[in-house]
């Protein structure tokens, strides 16, 4: 409530036309995302205290935020407007895009509509009527009538990519349908369509549960899949639940196994090097799949945090946290990191020893999600301090997810812990991969031939790396 009070005089930001155009001009996406994100955060920070207090003090400001959102041509981010059939980075009034930005806002607005419609109607019925219309045409109708969004994976081709966008967008859409659609037949069709789409994400992921995108993306990938599956289970009265499937548990435990210590995590691909994850989310996921490892890890993370901290996240995660926080706080923080973790299909391997060393290495291929050309690379930590590091990724720009990606130094093998072979670095493409990848848990020994990750001009037949 105190946090919400600080937004009672918030000045709603305008996302200008030039903010969208800047992505095309310079590749800068933050100039558009900053005011858009601030408005969305303000809306959430006003909604939750109104739910907690229920006195109507925050309603007028929420209406201002809703109105500002409805007046926007698009809720999609400038960097994602290439999903429009007309392409570009400027929003078209003739079509709608479901991306991470529009989905997140729509998910929040659907909660606001569901819970605050009576309050809005007391002020003026046109407010909720307008909001319901915008959610219908931008999200519900668009999702049911369009197949061309790559993240849906309905037109997935062999070798195609399915990443965190899939469960993330489908979760947002599912929440909108559950809260807004009153026709049971239409709702059933929509729910089934989301299930078909999310199946592609689960099927894309290896059975070992490794997250190609790294720990900092886990909350948006497997973590959002958990949110989706939990909402699906809740919405169907538990009749549709796959929490007993081994792959779902494996995908969850990845986050606990990738923790080095003192806030450091294994950061392959575009992942950040610090941040152990959302303790409340990890606890709920762990409880759903009956994983003591995840639950103990969550308790450990919680013991490190501010005990009086305000829960954060989208409305669904906030409500779920309020339901589970007391149980989490009652657990003892006795997390013990595994001695090793081996992902035979994803080809990630983590090993520790009694001298305080932690080594993380990978085989893999050079077309993974958020790919770096890094087959065979490694990171080394001593007493949780990074010694040999992965530099990670810089600030996202237009260049990051374009044909120019591998002109960025952080994406190149020669800026990872890998050799230049005859002056030649590794190359991008699914065919450039580590081969003969093996791990012996008895000897704590990992090896991989990385020669096959280099192009022909490297003139290398075999190069075995072992740890």
Please provide the spans of the model-predicted regions:
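Long, well-ordered core segments of solenoidal/helical folds
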Residues: 4-15, 62-80, 127-153, 189-209, ...
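Non-membrane alpha-helical segments in proteins
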Residues: 37-52, 64-68, 103-111
């Amino acid at each position: 409530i105190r946090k919400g009070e600080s937004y009672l005089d918030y000045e709603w930001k305008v996302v200008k036309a030039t903010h969208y155009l800047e992505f095309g001009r310079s590749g800068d996406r933050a100039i558009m995302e900053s005011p858009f994100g601030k408005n969305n955060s303000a809306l959430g920070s006003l909604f939750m205290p109104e739910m907690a207090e229920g006195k109507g003090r925050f309603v007028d400001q929420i209406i201002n935020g809703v109105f500002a959102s409805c007046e926007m041509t698009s809720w999609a981010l400038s960097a994602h407007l290439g999903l429009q059939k007309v392409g570009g980075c400027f929003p078209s009034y003739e079509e709608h895009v479901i991306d991470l930005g529009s989905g997140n806002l729509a998910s929040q607005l659907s909660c606001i509509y569901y819970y605050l419609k009576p309050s809005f109607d007391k002020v003026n019925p046109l407010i909720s009527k307008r909001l319901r219309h915008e959610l219908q045409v931008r999200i519900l109708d668009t999702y049911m009538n369009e197949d061309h969004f790559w993240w849906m994976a309905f037109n997935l081709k062999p070798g195609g990519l399915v990443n965190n966008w899939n469960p993330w967008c489908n979760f947002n859409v599912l929440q909108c349908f559950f809260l807004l659609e009153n026709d049971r037949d239409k709702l059933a069709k929509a729910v089934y369509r989301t299930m078909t789409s999310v199946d592609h994400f689960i099927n894309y992921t290896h059975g070992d549960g490794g997250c190609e995108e790294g720990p900092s993306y886990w909350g948006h990938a497997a973590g959002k899949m958990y949110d989706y599956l939990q909402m699906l289970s809740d919405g169907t009265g538990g009749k549709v639940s796959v929490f007993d499937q081994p792959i779902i548990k494996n995908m969850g435990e990845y986050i606990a196994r990738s923790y080095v210590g003192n806030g450091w995590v294994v950061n392959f691909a575009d992942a950040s090097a610090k941040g152990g994850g959302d303790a409340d989310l990890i606890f709920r996921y762990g409880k759903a799949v009956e994983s003591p490892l995840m639950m103990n890890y969550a308790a450990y993370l919680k013991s490190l945090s501010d005990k009086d901290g305000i829960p954060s996240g989208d409305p669904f995660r906030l409500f779920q946290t309020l339901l589970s926080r007391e149980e989490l706080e009652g657990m003892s923080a006795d997390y013990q990191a595994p001695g090793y973790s081996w992902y035979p299909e994803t080809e990630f391997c983590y090993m520790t020893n009694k001298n305080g060393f932690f080594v993380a290495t990978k085989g893999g291929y050079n077309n993974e999600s958020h790919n770096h050309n890094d087959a065979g690379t490694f990171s080394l930590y001593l007493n949780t301090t990074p010694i040999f590091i992965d530099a990670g990724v810089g600030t996202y720009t237009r260049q990051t997810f374009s044909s120019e990606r591998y002109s960025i130094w952080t994406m190149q093998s020669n800026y990872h812990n890998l050799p230049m072979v005859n002056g030649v670095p590794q190359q991008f493409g699914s065919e450039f991969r580590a081969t003969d990848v093996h791990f012996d848990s008895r000897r704590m020994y990992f090896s991989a031939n990385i020669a096959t990750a280099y192009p022909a001009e490297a003139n290398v037949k075999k190069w075995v790396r072992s740890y």
